[in-house]
Amino acid sequence: MHIEKLDFENSPYLGVFGIATDKVVLIREGLQEKKLEVIREVLKVPVVEASLMKSRIIGVLGAGNSNAIIVPWYVWDSELEKIKNAFREYGIDTEVVPFQTKYTALGNLILTNDKGALVSSKFSREEAKKIGDILGVEVERGVIAGIVAVGSAGVVTNKGGLVHPEATDEELEWLSDLFKVDVYVGTANMGVPYVGSCMLANSYGVVVGHLTTGPEIVKIEEALGFI
């Protein structure tokens, strides 16, 4: 099965609590084992439990692709070491890189796959270049449908992308060129336009908030390359 509906302690906003790539899922601590097992089965990569600055909202605070995961620069040393040790145990060669900036919610401000990255226009050009260098991809600054929180306004994998329903045709073409995949508009969790906050997805599957409707699931499957 490549798509499943889940809740995290009754919250349908799965993307807030994790970071998914084609090599690993970094997930908040404290979830039931049966839910971790669903994530492993659907996304088909190791699942590593973690916290960032003792917070569970690691999908808000961090972002990444197969090359690197970017976290706030003041992440605790013990947390960073725990993540790196887990990656070593699983043989995961993804770097974990603290990034110095005045912004904390990096996951809300960075949208990336293994082919490109869109960073919020809030970042300076110099910061954007550094982010692109860390992630090892082409990077552009911008917004989606006028929204600076591009990481919450979209989800993108190496197979496809889904973004805020008010994105224009021109934006979809631009995003498709940047990420080298087809990008569509859609919603999740019964009409929520901030799809990046609603799901965890990679090239192998997607877990989405339990409030997501049947028509929304069909659109998500199409956009992320499973149909």
Swiss-Prot record:
SUPFAM superfamilies with a match to the protein in the record: Pentein
CDD domains: IF6
A GO molecular-function descriptor: translation initiation factor activity
Record-linked InterPro entries: eIF6
SMART domains, alphabetized: eIF6 (SM00654)
Family membership: Belongs to the eIF-6 family.
Its job: Binds to the 50S ribosomal subunit and prevents its association with the 30S ribosomal subunit to form the 70S initiation complex.
Name the record gives this protein: Translation initiation factor 6
Species of the source: Pyrococcus furiosus (strain ATCC 43587 / DSM 3638 / JCM 8422 / Vc1)
